[in-house]
C-alpha cells in the first residue's frame, strides 16, 4: 500500500476508503499544525517509511521538555554551548547554571515563538552581534550573574517585543550613552549589584520612554544619575548605595514615579525641595540611613504620599522634627508609631516621633540671614531677589504684588523660586513692578521680609543708540541692557539732566524709590511711588535715595568708553576698506593704460622693419600714369644727348629688397654713363644744371609714400 507523504505542502493522498489508521492520523496532524513558511523554520512531519528532519516534539538529550516541547529546561547540565536541537515551537527556554561563555550569532534564530530566555548564572563574557536575531516574540531576557563587562547594546537589535532585561550582578564598569535605545519597548530594567560600576553617562537611559521599573541598587553610586528621560518610570530602587546627600533636582522629570526605595543608602542630608518633582509619589522608604532631621514641609508637595518608612535613623528630636510629627498625625493618624523613634536627646530617646508635640520643646521663629533688597532694573533684564536663612530646615515662599503665593516647583513663565529660596526673574517686564514678600517658616512660626522691584521701560531711542544714553550721560545702561543676564547693581549720581526740574528734598522718613525713569529713558518720575511696608520679625533693610536720580547698569564691562572704542574700531575698519577699494581701482586703470600703450608700441614696431626705399629718376614732364606703367629702361645709343626729343625710359621697378643697391646704381649709370668725361648731353650746358626728379617709394604693402626731391 502506498503511503501518504506530508512535508510542508499537501501531496496526493489515497482515497479515504483505502487509507490506513496511521495515515489518517498523519493527515489530521498536518491539518492542525502551523503551515510552513519559507525560511520560517517550519516542522516537517514524515511517516515511518519516509526520511526527513527530527519530529517537532523531539527534545535535546541534555534537557527536559514539557507541554509538547514548548518548555525546555536545560539547567545544571554543565553545557558549554547552547544546544542546537531545541524544538522550534519552544516558548520557554531555561539555560541557567551552566558553563556557557559565548553567545554566538544566530544561536536562537529558529526559535521564532520563544518568549522567555534564561541565561543567568553562567560564565557568559561575550555576546556577539546578532546573537538574539530571529526572536521577534522574546519578552524576557535574563543575563544576571554572569561575567559581562559591558552592556551588549548591539545584541539587542530587533528585539521589538522585549519587556524585561536583567543584567544584575555583572562586572559591568560603565553604562555608555544610548545603551538601551535599541529596545524602547523595555518595561523593567534590572541593573542592581553592579559593584564595579564607575560611570553612568548623562544619556545612558535615553530612549527608554516606556520603562516602568529601574533597579540601580547596590551599585556604589555616590550621586543619583540623570533620569530625566524616564518620563513613565513608576518604581525606582536606589537602596544599598552611598548617597550621602540628596539634592534638589535629583528626581527631575520623574512625575510618574509612585515608589522610591532608598534603604541602606547612607543618606545623611536631604535638602529643601529635594522631592518636589515627585508629584505622584505614593510610597517612600528612607529606613536604615543616617538622617537626624528633615527640612520643614519636605513632604507637603507630595499630595499622594501615603506610606513613609523612617525607622532605623538617628533622629534628633527638636523643633526641626516637630513638623514631621504633625504631618504623621495627619497622614497616618491610625498608626503614629510605625515610622521612627527619637535617638536624641536622652530625655526623648526611644519616643516615637508621631507622639511628640510642641510642649516638649521651646522653639523660635526663623531668622532671615540675607533679606531681599530693593532693586531697580530695566525691562528685559534678569533679576534676583534673595532670601536666605541660616538653616535648610525651613521653607521659603514668596508673595507677589498680585497676591500669588510662589513656592519652589510652582513655576511660571518667567518667575520661579530656586531651591535656596531666591526669587528668580529670567526676563522682567513693567508689570512685574511692585512689592515682593519673602516668608520663611518653621515649626515655631514664620518671618517675612519685603523688597520693591522697580522695572523701567526701555526708551526706543536710547536703546537704539550705541550708549543708549541721553544728554548729560547717565544712559549707558540702556545700550548695555542686552548684555546683562543675571545680576545688576544700582548706581547713583548727583548730576541733573538738562531741562529736568529739581526734585524736592526727601523727608526723614525712608521710603522705597519709585521706578527709575530719568532722561536716559525719556520719561519723568511718577507723581507718587507705591510704598513698600515690611511686617517681619527680621525686617529687610531699605535703601535710601539721597540723590537726584538713579539708574541701573550691568556689572559687566560694557561701559560708554567701551562703546566709543567700538565705534572707533568700526570707523577705522571702514577707512581701511575704502583705501583698499581705491587702490584696487587705480591699479586696474593703470593696468588698462599700460596694456593700450604696449599694443600701440608693438604695432609700430611691426611696421617699421618692413619698409624699404627705392629712388627712381623720372622725367619732370612724365605723367603720373606713364610713370607707373613704365616696364623697362631704354638704352642710350651713341653719344649722350643725341636726339634731344627722345625721352629717357626708366628701368623696371623691382621689389627685391636685397638687390636694392644694385638697381639704384644701374639707374645712375644709365643716366650719366654716356658721357665719360662727365660732360652733359647734346642739349647743352643748361641741361646739366637741372636734376631729374627722384621718386621715393616705400616697400611696405600697407603704406605708400612718394616724395619728390
Swiss-Prot record:
It is found in: Membrane; Presynaptic cell membrane. The chain crosses the membrane at residues 575-595. It comes from the Eukaryota. Mainly expressed in the brain. Widespread distribution in various brain regions (at protein level). Detected both embryonically and postnatally with stronger expression in postnatal stages. Residues 366-454 form the Ig-like C2-type domain. InterPro entries: Cys-rich_flank_reg_C (IPR000483), Ig-like_dom (IPR007110), Ig-like_dom_sf (IPR036179), Ig-like_fold (IPR013783), Ig_I-set (IPR013098), Ig_sub (IPR003599), Ig_sub2 (IPR003598), Leu-rich_rpt (IPR001611). Residues 528-544 have a biased composition (Low complexity). Residues 50-88 form the LRRNT domain. GO terms for molecular function: signaling receptor binding. Pfam families: I-set (PF07679), LRR_1 (PF00560), LRR_8 (PF13855). The keyword Chloroplast does not apply. Keywords: Cell membrane, Cell projection, Disulfide bond, Glycoprotein, Immunoglobulin domain, Leucine-rich repeat, Membrane, Phosphoprotein, Repeat, Signal, Synapse, Transmembrane, Transmembrane helix. The keyword Membrane applies. The extreme C-terminus binds to the first 2 PDZ domains of DLG4. This is Leucine-rich repeat-containing protein 4B. It comes from Rattus norvegicus.
Amino acid at each position: 500500500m502506498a503511503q501518504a507523504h506530508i512535508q510542508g505542502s499537501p501531496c496526493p493522498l489515497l482515497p479515504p476508503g483505502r487509507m490506513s489508521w496511521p495515515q489518517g492520523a498523519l493527515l489530521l496532524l498536518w491539518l492542525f499544525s502551523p503551515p510552513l513558511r519559507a525560511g520560517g523554520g517550519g516542522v516537517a512531519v514524515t511517516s515511518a517509511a519516509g526520511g526527513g528532519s527530527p519530529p517537532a516534539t523531539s527534545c535535546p538529550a541534555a534537557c527536559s521538555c514539557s507541554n509538547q516541547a514548548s518548555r525546555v529546561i536545560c539547567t545544571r547540565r554543565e553545557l558549554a554551548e547552547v544546544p542546537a536541537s531545541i524544538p522550534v515551537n519552544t516558548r520557554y527556554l531555561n539555560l541557567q547554571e551552566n558553563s556557557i561563555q559565548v553567545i554566538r550569532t544566530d544561536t536562537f534564530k529558529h526559535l521564532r515563538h520563544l518568549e522567555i530566555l534564561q541565561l543567568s548564572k553562567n560564565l557568559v563574557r561575550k555576546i556577539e552581534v546578532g546573537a538574539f536575531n530571529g526572536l521577534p516574540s522574546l519578552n524576557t531576557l535574563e543575563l544576571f550573574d554572569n561575567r559581562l563587562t559591558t552592556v551588549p547594546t548591539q545584541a539587542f537589535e530587533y528585539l521589538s517585543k522585549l519587556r524585561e532585561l536583567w543584567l544584575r550582578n555583572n562586572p559591568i564598569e560603565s553604562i555608555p550613552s544610548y545603551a538601551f535605545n535599541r529596545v524602547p519597548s523595555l518595561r523593567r530594567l534590572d541593573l542592581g549589584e553592579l559593584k564595579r560600576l564607575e560611570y553612568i553617562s548623562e544619556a545612558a537611559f535615553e530612549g527608554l520612554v516606556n520603562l516602568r521599573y529601574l533597579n540601580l541598587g547596590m551599585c556604589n553610586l555616590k550621586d543619583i544619575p540623570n533620569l530625566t528621560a524616564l518620563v513613565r518610570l513608576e518604581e525606582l530602587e536606589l537602596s544599598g548605595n552611598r548617597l550621602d546627600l540628596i539634592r534638589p533636582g535629583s528626581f527631575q522629570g520623574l512625575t510618574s514615579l509612585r515608589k522610591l526605595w532608598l534603604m541602606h543608602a547612607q543618606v545623611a542630608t536631604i535638602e529643601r525641595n529635594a522631592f518636589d518633582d515627585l508629584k505622584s509619589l505614593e510610597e517612600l522608604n528612607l529606613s536604615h540611613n543616617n538622617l537626624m532631621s528633615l527640612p520643614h514641609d519636605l513632604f507637603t508637595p507630595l499630595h499622594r504620599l501615603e506610606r513613609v518608612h523612617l525607622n532605623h535613623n538617628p533622629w534628633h528630636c527638636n523643633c526641626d522634627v516637630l513638623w514631621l510629627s504633625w504631618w504623621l498625625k495627619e497622614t497616618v493618624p491610625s498608626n503614629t508609631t510605625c515610622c521612627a523613634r527619637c535617638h536624641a536627646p536622652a530625655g526623648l530617646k526611644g519616643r516615637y516621633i508621631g507622639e511628640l508635640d510642641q510642649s516638649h520643646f521651646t522653639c523660635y521663629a526663623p531668622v532671615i540671614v540675607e533679606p531681599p533688597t530693593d532693586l531697580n532694573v530695566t525691562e528685559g533684564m534678569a533679576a534676583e531677589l534673595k532670601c536666605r536663612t541660616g538653616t535648610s530646615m525651613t521653607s521659603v515662599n514668596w508673595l507677589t504684588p498680585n497676591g500669588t503665593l510662589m513656592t519652589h516647583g510652582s513655576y511660571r513663565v518667567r518667575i520661579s523660586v530656586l531651591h535656596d529660596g531666591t526669587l528668580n526673574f529670567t526676563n522682567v517686564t513693567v508689570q512685574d513692578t511692585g512689592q515682593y514678600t519673602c516668608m520663611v517658616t518653621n515649626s515655631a512660626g514664620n518671618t517675612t521680609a519685603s523688597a520693591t522691584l522697580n522695572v523701567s521701560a526701555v526708551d526706543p531711542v536710547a536703546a537704539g543708540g550705541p550708549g543708549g544714553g541721553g544728554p548729560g550721560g547717565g544712559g549707558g545702561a540702556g545700550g548695555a541692557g542686552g548684555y546683562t543676564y543675571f545680576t545688576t547693581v544700582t548706581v547713583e549720581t548727583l548730576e541733573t539732566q538738562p531741562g529736568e526740574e529739581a526734585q524736592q528734598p526727601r523727608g526723614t522718613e525712608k521710603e522705597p524709590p519709585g521706578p527709575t525713569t530719568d532722561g536716559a529713558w525719556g520719561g519723568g518720575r511718577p507723581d507718587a511711588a507705591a510704598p513698600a511696608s515690611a511686617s517681619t520679625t527680621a525686617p529687610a533693610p531699605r535703601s535710601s535715595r539721597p540723590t537726584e536720580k538713579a539708574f541701573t547698569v550691568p556689572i559687566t564691562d560694557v561701559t560708554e568708553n567701551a562703546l566709543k572704542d567700538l565705534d572707533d574700531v568700526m570707523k577705522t575698519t571702514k577707512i581701511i576698506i575704502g583705501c583698499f577699494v581705491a587702490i584696487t581701482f587705480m591699479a586696474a586703470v593703470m593696468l588698462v593704460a599700460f596694456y593700450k600703450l604696449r599694443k600701440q608700441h608693438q604695432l609700430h614696431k611691426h611696421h617699421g622693419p618692413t619698409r624699404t626705399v627705392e629712388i627712381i629718376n623720372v622725367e619732370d614732364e612724365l605723367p603720373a600714369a606713364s610713370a607707373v606703367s613704365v616696364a623697362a629702361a631704354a638704352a642710350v645709343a651713341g653719344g649722350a644727348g643725341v636726339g634731344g626729343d627722345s625721352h629717357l625710359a626708366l628701368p623696371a621697378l623691382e621689389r627685391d629688397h636685397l638687390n636694392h643697391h644694385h638697381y639704384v646704381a644701374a639707374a645712375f649709370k644709365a643716366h650719366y654713363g654716356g658721357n665719360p668725361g662727365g660732360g652733359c648731353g647734346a642739349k647743352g650746358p643748361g641741361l646739366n644744371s637741372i636734376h631729374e626728379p627722384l621718386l621715393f617709394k616705400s616697400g611696405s604693402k600697407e603704406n605708400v609714400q612718394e616724395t619728390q626731391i
